[in-house]
Amino acid sequence: MNDIFSALYAPLSKAQTEEYLLRIGYSGVHHATKEVLAELMQCHFMSVPFENLDVYYAHKEPDLSTASLYDKIVKNRRGGYCFELNGLFLHLLRAFGFSCTARQARIIKGEFLSPPSHEVIVVKIDGKSLFCDVGFGGPVPPSPVEIICDSVQESDGRRYMFSDGGE
């Protein structure tokens, strides 16, 4: 059981981090700032596609271990879905020194309240919680957005609102 958790949460090595940065085309500084986070997100969006082919066509359980995600996204230059893309991006952010956690989220369309089925990243910078999502196959904020519950936020001309999950 301990080996499963070790594989899922294994950090990226320095070499893996550098290869990941080459994959997304990032050559900037390695600082844990909001500006660097925004640039990393932008590079990731431009280089790694959302894809869910394995979920529907591979007929196998997804392997969300760091090594498997690294091989698929960096080595094999594929994309992935939220648990894969945000999962590996979380490790990249931690390698940069960001304080961040993966969180479950739900996508609300109209009045329908679906169960939480999406993974996002919450990054803490200067006492603020920032929303980060590089793994959604639809419109998302292209840069970090401060999480302020029940307040409409704008990013790149689109409006977003965060809720604590209450009805």
Report each predicted region and the residues it spans:
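Short amphipathic alpha-helical patches
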Residues: 63-64, 93, 116-117
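Residue-level marker of positions within ordered structural domains that often coincide
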Residues: 45, 87, 126
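General N-terminal targeting signals
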Residues: 54-57, 67, 86, 117, ...
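Short active-site-adjacent helix-start/loop capping segments
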Residues: 58-61, 91, 110-112
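His-Asp-centered catalytic microenvironments across diverse enzyme cores
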Residues: 2-19, 23-24, 28, 49-50, ...
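Secondary-structure boundary elements
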Residues: 8-77
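Cysteine-centered nucleophilic/redox motifs
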Residues: 78-103, 121
